[in-house]
C-alpha cells in the first residue's frame, strides 16, 4: 500500500545526504546555514524547504544537534578545559558556548561533564 504522505524526490534526498556529508566535515568551523547552502549551490530558503520536507526539521536544528554532539564528545572523552573546547569548535568565547549548550540541552557544560565522569 502506498503511503498517503508524499515521498521526497530523489534530488531532495541527495541534497540532504550531501548536506550531512558537509556537516560532518565542516561543523567544527561553520554553524551557519548559508555556508552549507552555498557549498551545495542552493539558496538557504531552498535548503530549509528540502530539509523540512525530507527530515521534518530545519538545517539549523540539525547543525545545532551536530554541534551539541561534538561538545558532548569533547566533554566525555577529553579533559580539555571548556575554553579550549570553545576554541576547537570556533566559538567566539567559552561563555557563549556555555549559553549555547545550556539553551539546547537544558544542562550546563560543567554539570554534563560531571555527570559523565560519574558514569
Description of each model-found segment:
Residues 1-46, 59, 114-119:
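Inter-domain helical "communication" segments and dimerization helices
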Residues 54-95, 114-119:
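Terminal helix-turn-helix DNA-binding modules in bacterial transcription factors
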Residues 99-119:
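…primarily DNA-binding HTH/wHTH and HhH modules…
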Residues 47, 96-97, 101:
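Short hydrophobic/aromatic patch on the recognition helix
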Residues 40, 89-90, 101:
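Core residues of bacterial helix-turn-helix
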